UniProtKB/Swiss-Prot annotation:
The lineage of its organism: Eukaryota, Amoebozoa, Evosea, Eumycetozoa, Dictyostelia. It comes from the Eukaryota. One of its GO terms (biological process) is phenylalanyl-tRNA aminoacylation. This is Phenylalanine--tRNA ligase beta subunit. It is an enzyme of class 6 (ligase). Tetramer of two alpha and two beta subunits. It comes from Dictyostelium discoideum.
Length: 617
């Protein structure tokens, strides 16, 4: 959860609390009731001491409250938002009514070039006119940008914010994408002019906090850049603004531009910045729009767009879900306390809520129910014993896994736990298999080692053998864990715990894998382990192979194994696994120096464990 650092004295002043009489415990209770948490009480001096190890007496010793807020409550990421919400909650302020005014003149336009589509296609903008900053509000303005960048903006990769002194610029503005060498300007907090290529090199070689953002656009042949009508660079998103339009305490008119890969997130960020600080404008809670024009010369709209959406919530649903019994009019009153204007439907069976632009977290009636519960007070909710009796128990598949893990350990095998993610080769080519598209791939893999979800336990067992070359032979290891297989979408048969249809496009299988490594391949060791497993599960040997009851073995042509040594395991007429001596090419792929034999079984309740679980129950 994001933490917001706020000066206690400034916060208390904004809330109308008298510092000498309002205690920390009272504030903690207020936070809990509202749904946030006072996580830590510290000071700037103490925070710097913890960071550097040296106490600096020149740093302020004012009390700082660190407040935990929900990750989706972007309106609570600054002093202004928290104070505004708590004042309405405490009946000390009315719900603010945000207003927009059209562009002051034809210069408040932003033109988009076609080239930006390949690098950062979305831009929106707005203006705070006649704003008055104090040192505290200025610091909060900067801090909110950093909080948004770290949260919804995903460290600027998804969205980035640029703020500028409008009086130093001349509209209209132009959003372009140019070659790095063609972008020249003096970046923020610098005195020398750089082109973008030189600037990236400068930041890459320095200890600047901006270094971590360079990879976002570094490999692009063109970089996004915003100019004014006099060809002055406003910003190089998502990296740095220009020094020319730097925001100062004396700034009166603020131009805010937000570039992004996602228009919805861009609008949320722009609206948050504007609504939080519009209270300092000459006309409080008023924002000026900017017209954005696309590459074809067509207007994409005026921003910000602050139309309130409406959500209907059934009165019975709210009462039942929250465990309360209050009237519809009481719900309207409680929602007003949570800064939500609402009214009753004509039949008074539902509540129509006007969701303000600051509450992007409200998307469903359940969110309305949650705010009613907060307004009602969690401490006021009555504890009730459920009118149904349930008995908890272990999931059958987990019970089966635990039973087999104990038995295999008693047979002298060591249990291992390995990574669920792997490379593509571990699912296919390293095991002498062709890629059949059955693996679930990670869309934004952090490492080349972890790009897919494993489809088998064989590869991780072989990796474990390879990693334990220094251990004395024989090596006897096993693992019981899940693998994931890509499956077609469809309606899952809930009565069948092993149904391969999943509403997420993939399904898990519980697998058992065991490996034996020694100077010679002794398949009888693994075969003996299989026989022990079948004995424990009360599955008889079907010597005739005709009854579909019991288990038997048949020759396998799986290229994982040395020809003539691969064996399929058939239980109740279904193939549930295989075992054999691992092929030398596969051993080479995993740098295994000695022969290995492997057993891999799919564990299912209906096929593998029906007898033993029925007996135990």
């Amino acid at each position: 959860m994001p933490k917001v650092n706020i000066n206690r004295d400034i916060l208390y002043k904004a809330l109308g609390f008298y510092i000498k009489t309002y205690t920390q415990e009272q504030f903690e209770d207020l936070c809990f009731a509202f749904g946030v948490e006072l996580d830590e009480v510290t000071s700037e001096r103490e925070m710097k001491k913890n960071e550097t190890g040296v106490e600096d007496l020149t740093v302020s010793d004012d009390v700082i409250y660190k407040i935990d807020v929900s990750a989706n409550r972007y309106d609570l990421l600054c002093l202004e938002g928290i104070a505004r919400a708590l004042n309405v909650y405490n009946h000390k302020a009315s719900i603010p009514k945000y207003q927009i005014v059209p562009p002051k003149n034809s210069h408040e336009k932003l033109y988009i070039s076609k080239e930006v589509e390949s690098v950062r296609p979305v831009i929106v903008a707005g203006i705070l006119r006649d704003i008055t900053f104090t040192q505290e509000s200025y610091d909060s303005f900067i801090d909110l940008q950093e909080k948004l960048h770290a949260n919804i903006c995903k460290k600027r990769s998804l969205v980035s914010i640029g703020t500028h002194d409008l009086d130093t610029l001349s509209g209209p503005f132009y959003y372009k994408a140019l070659a790095p060498k063609d972008i020249k300007f003096v970046p923020l907090s610098q005195t020398k002019e750089y082109n973008a290529e030189e600037l990236f090199k400068f930041y890459d070689e320095s200890s600047s906090h901006l270094k971590k953002f360079l990879p976002i656009i570094k490999d692009s042949p063109v970089y996004p850049v915003i100019y004014d009508s006099k060809n002055v660079v406003c910003s190089l998103p998502p990296i740095i603004n220009g020094e020319h339009s730097k925001i100062k305490l004396s700034t009166k008119n603020v131009f805010i531009e937000v570039t992004a890969n996602d228009r919805t997130k861009a609008n949320i960020v722009l609206n948050t910045m504007l609504t939080m600080f519009s209270e300092y404008c000459k006309q409080p809670f008023t924002m000026e729009q900017v017209e954005v024009i696309d590459a074809d010369g067509k207007s994409t709209g005026l921003y910000p767009q602050i139309q309130e959406k409406q959500i209907n919530a059934q009165v019975d649903y709210i009462n039942k879900s929250a465990g309360i019994n209050i009237t519809p009019n009481d719900m309207v009153t409680l929602l007003k306390r949570m800064s939500l204007q609402s009214k009753l439907s004509d039949d008074e069976k539902s509540i129509i809520v006007d969701v303000p632009v600051t509450r992007s977290d409200i998307m469903h009636a359940c969110d309305i129910m949650e705010d009613v519960a907060i307004g009602y007070g969690y401490d006021n909710l009555k504890k009730e014993i459920p009118n149904c009796n349930t008995i908890g128990r272990v999931q059958p598949i987990n019970k089966l896994s635990e039973l087999l893990a104990n038995e295999i350990a008693l047979a002298g095998f060591t249990e291992i736990m390995t990574f669920v993610l792997c490379q593509n080769r571990d699912n296919f080519t390293a095991l002498n298999k062709a890629d059949d598209g059955s693996s679930v791939k990670i869309s934004n893999a952090v490492s080349e080692e972890f790009t897919e979800v494993r489809t088998n336990l064989v590869s991780t067992l072989l990796k474990s053998v390879s990693a334990n070359k220094a251990a004395p032979l024989p090596l006897k290891m096993f693992e019981i864990s899940d693998v994931s297989i890509k499956g077609s979408l469809g309606n899952k048969d809930l009565s069948d715990p092993n149904s391969n249809n999943s509403d997420v496009g993939a399904y898990n299988k519980r697998m058992l894998g065991a490996i034996y490594c020694n100077q010679s391949a002794k398949i009888e060791v693994i075969h003996g382990l299989l026989d022990r497993i079948m004995l424990v599960l009360d599955i008889k040997l079907d010597a005739t192979r005709s009854s579909n009851k019991g288990y038997y073995l048949e020759l396998s042509n799986d290229k994982l194994f040395l020809p003539g040594t691969g064996i399929n395991v058939i239980v109740n007429g279904k193939r549930v696994g295989h075992m054999g001596i691992v092929h030398p090419l596969v051993l080479k792929n995993y740098s295994c120096s000695f022969p290995c034999t492997i057993l891999e079984l799919e564990l299912t309740i209906d096929t593998m464990a029906h007898n033993v679980l029925l007996r135990e129950n």
